């Protein structure tokens, strides 16, 4: 089975923490950095707190000096459609729950220490519905059509080191009817601020597969994309460590490669795990791939990818086999909202849904 870091970043389901190192800093409700450890190889912070929101269009709201004092204060995730008012005259129609849609704006003020100036700083958005556009300090970063995929933007060239920074997000769900189900509106999933060194594992840069699986041994294939954003070539050493559920390193592999300036290289490693604990529905055992990148003796990045070791096979005569055992697949009609909470669904709701599916 395959495991990319992308699929694990979106909700952090069932408590699988995606952070590479411990969260090295945090933002308070006012968007101020309240702690920092600049020596960390990688920093990944929740960016959910201290946002301002306006329901409706607000021309010029992308500019850092725009007056947002009277905007509503809130934390993410957020779905404005579920807040109503609901009316049969809403263009979303019956399939959209007669919910209000339209345009909404989000703004967040934040400050970073001057020590971040040598890092690449990105914003990651796990889901915005829909047709979002993002600015940093008045500079346009891009548009994400539709609204279910996660995406990221590089903030680095436009940041004010040590000064005030403003992220603005315009969400446009005004083209209605647009769905055969309730979609919600807004930044309905988590947001993150990520700071890395110039040499680092690329965004969603790991891909883990388990092409050979048995109770005696498993072959783990690891593909890792490392970027060098320095102006000179760098000889990089990648250490891939497989860590079990108790935090014990069960196997490691090292590989080195010179990567040219402003270039990217994909490493490939084959790692054997003896007597693996197999992932199954009854016992969903998880390992972690810990990727450490060094240039010389300096650790420049650390990155973790959760994965399970299992074999999945579809057979015309025996049906679906998981680790060689027949498993009956049950399906349900499930959309991404959760009733009265709309599309900004708490993780525990998703966990409970999976528990019900497991017990069917």
Indicate where each model-derived feature is located.
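N-terminal secretory signal peptides
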Residues: 1-9, 20-22, 26, 34
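Accessory carbohydrate-binding/adhesion or oligomerization-edge regions at the termini
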Residues: 12, 16-20, 31-92, 166-170, ...
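Accessory beta-strand-rich segments of carbohydrate-active enzymes
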Residues: 57, 96, 101-204, 229
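Active-site-adjacent substrate/metal-binding segments within catalytic domains
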Residues: 82-112, 116-124, 130-135, 204-206, ...
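Solvent-exposed, conformationally flexible loop/turn segments
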Residues: 103, 162, 217, 260-264
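Short glycine/proline/serine/threonine-rich loop/turn segments at secondary-structure transition edges
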Residues: 118-119, 159-164, 274-286
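Beta-strand-rich binding/interaction modules
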Residues: 219-257
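Intrinsically disordered, low-complexity Pro/Gly/Ser/Thr-rich segments with frequent PxxP/GP/PP motifs
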Residues: 252-275
């Amino acid at each position: 089975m395959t495991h990319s870091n992308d699929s694990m970043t979106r909700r952090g389901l069932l408590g699988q923490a995606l952070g590479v190192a411990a969260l090295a800093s945090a933002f308070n409700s006012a968007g101020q950095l309240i702690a920092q450890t600049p020596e960390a190889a990688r920093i990944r912070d929740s960016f959910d707190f201290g946002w301002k929101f306006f329901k409706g269009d607000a021309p010029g709201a992308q500019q850092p000096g725009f007056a947002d004092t009277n905007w509503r204060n809130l934390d993410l995730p957020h779905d404005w459609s579920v807040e109503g008012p609901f009316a049969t005259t809403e263009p979303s129609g019956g399939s959209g729950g007669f919910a209000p849609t339209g345009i909404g704006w989000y703004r967040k003020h934040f400050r970073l220490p001057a020590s971040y100036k040598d890092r690449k700083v990105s914003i990651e958005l796990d889901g915005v519905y829909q047709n979002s556009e993002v600015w940093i300090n008045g500079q346009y970063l891009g548009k994400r059509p539709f609204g279910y995929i996660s995406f990221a933007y590089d903030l680095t060239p436009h940041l004010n080191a040590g000064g005030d920074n403003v992220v603005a997000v315009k969400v446009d769900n005004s083209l209605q009817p647009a769905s055969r189900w309730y979609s919600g509106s807004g930044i309905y999933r988590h947001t993150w601020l990520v700071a890395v060194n110039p040499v680092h594992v690329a965004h969603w840069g790991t891909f883990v597969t388990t092409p050979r699986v048995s109770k005696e041994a498993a072959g783990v294939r690891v593909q890792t994309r490392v970027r060098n954003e320095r102006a000179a070539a760098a000889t990089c050493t990648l250490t891939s460590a497989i860590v079990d559920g108790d935090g014990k390193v069960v196997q490691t592999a090292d590989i080195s490669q010179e990567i040219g300036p402003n270039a990217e290289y994909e490493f490939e490693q084959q790692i054997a795990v003896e007597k693996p604990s197999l992932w199954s529905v009854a016992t969903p055992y998880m390992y972690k791939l810990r990727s450490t990148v060094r240039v010389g003796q300096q650790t420049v990045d650390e990155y973790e990818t959760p994965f399970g070791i299992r074999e999945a096979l579809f057979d015309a005569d025996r049906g679906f086999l998981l680790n060689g055992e027949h498993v009956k697949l049950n399906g349900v009609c499930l959309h991404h909202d959760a009733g009265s909470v709309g599309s900004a669904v708490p993780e525990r709701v998703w966990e409970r849904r999976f528990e019900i599916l497991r017990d069917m």
